[in-house]
Amino acid sequence: METFDVKFPKVSDKLKWKDLFPEWIDENEASAKPKCPEIPMPVFEEYEELDAVVAKVPCKHVGVDGSRDVFRLQVNLVVANLLVRSGGWNKNRRVYAVLIGDCGPMWEIFRCEDMLLHEENLWVYKPELEKLKQKILMPVGSCQLALPFSKQGQEIQKNYSKTLFYKPREAYVTVLHSSEAYVCGAIALAQSIIQTNSTRDLVLLADDSISPKSLHGLRAAGWKIKKIKRIRSPHAKKNAYNEWNYSKLRIWQLKDYDKVIFIDSDFVVFRNIDKFFSYPELSATGNDGYIFNSGVMIVEPSKCKFQNLMKKRFEVGSYNGGDQGFLNEMFVWWHRWPSKLNTLKIFRNSRHRNLPDDSYTVHYLGLKPWTCYKDYDCNWDKVESQKFASDSAHERWWKVYKKMPMALREYCALTPEMDARIIKWRKKAKKANLLDGHWRIPVKDSRRLTY
């Protein structure tokens, strides 16, 4: 047996995680095309047709998952690149990775499905090379957009669509739990996806809080229903809004699908996004700092991933007590989608309230459109909610509603409780003489006559 020492320059200690995962990049290339810092690699031509690669994985934080360590990322990428090149781009040689260290390999790169052995601080993998190729063609961080906005993306799309022996099983998925407050939102979401001529399945995970009547409406809207037991967020406060948000982890149990795009049920889709299924897990849009927003993301369902997430949920923290904080600690190496794939309805500049016309989706933060009158965005009636107010975005949601069959519209009915709340805050807005003047708008919403 012949062995080689693989030599490569260690990445500079000056390179920090935030350099690889900046909060913002110039997606439109208005001033310059975004570039990622270089992570040195070996001279790969010197190490061809290896049967196995053995590496010691660095670990700054022993026993803590989600370590944002640039050197750790470098070692994992070196091993992945060596394996892909040794396996060959057009052949399927068996190659193995042996990774040693207390922190273990980065599971974003080395899939648990490919693991042959794990004993203490030793991991052995026989990777599926086509999957690994997709990973190494990605930028080294969220410092650049990937597919399909670059030649890399075209290569991945080509590999992904032509080398698999079967048509990938793909679906959009959302989750409803704990109450029926978002049933209307989920119906509108399904209808909006259908209105873009999507060809993918629609799957909705629902717990026991969703009534048979609502399930009937959700099915009629296009969702395939799968019943689930909700999962409590171990770091959330009792009765907090995100107390049961870990129920989202159930999407990793959808093993009937190769990939799913999760979308929160207070979204509406305005442009077809089927092409984004060509991205690998975990792809999402940026949020604050180096974290991603879990409102829209692509994942690859897997029994072992779900089991690992469930096991780690008590050990790994969450900055916000909910699923987004937890998932950002579990998937520290993620891929940036364009921000227009998750356009947040929030405005820091009060003068400009229109969302971009080319937005793929809109995330309706604040008071939801179906809890307001059709006539205007009721976020205007509360000073603390005005950052979420946009009449144009509100109108776009109601355009989706108007295209829905009449039988589905009843699930978006205005309840007496909703009406009373709106009237209460309209009166307060009038008394305060709020300058936007929306409280002056005559109400013509016909839903007021249905209760």
In which residue ranges do the predicted regions lie?
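A glycosyltransferase accessory/donor-loop signature
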Residues: 1-188, 305-306, 312-451
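Active-site regions of enzymes building and remodeling cell-envelope glycoconjugates
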Residues: 2-5, 112-117, 219-227, 281-283
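Conserved beta-strand termini and adjacent loop/short-helix elements that scaffold enzyme active sites
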Residues: 6, 205-207, 226-230, 286, ...
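Hydrophobic/aromatic residues located in beta-strands of well-ordered beta-sheets
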Residues: 97, 202-203
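GT-A fold catalytic core of metal-dependent nucleotide-sugar glycosyltransferases
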Residues: 158, 212, 221-236, 240-303
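Short, acidic, metal-binding catalytic loop of nucleotide-sugar glycosyltransferases
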Residues: 192-199
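Short active-site oxyanion
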Residues: 200-202, 258-259
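Glycosyltransferase specificity loop/lid
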Residues: 206-215
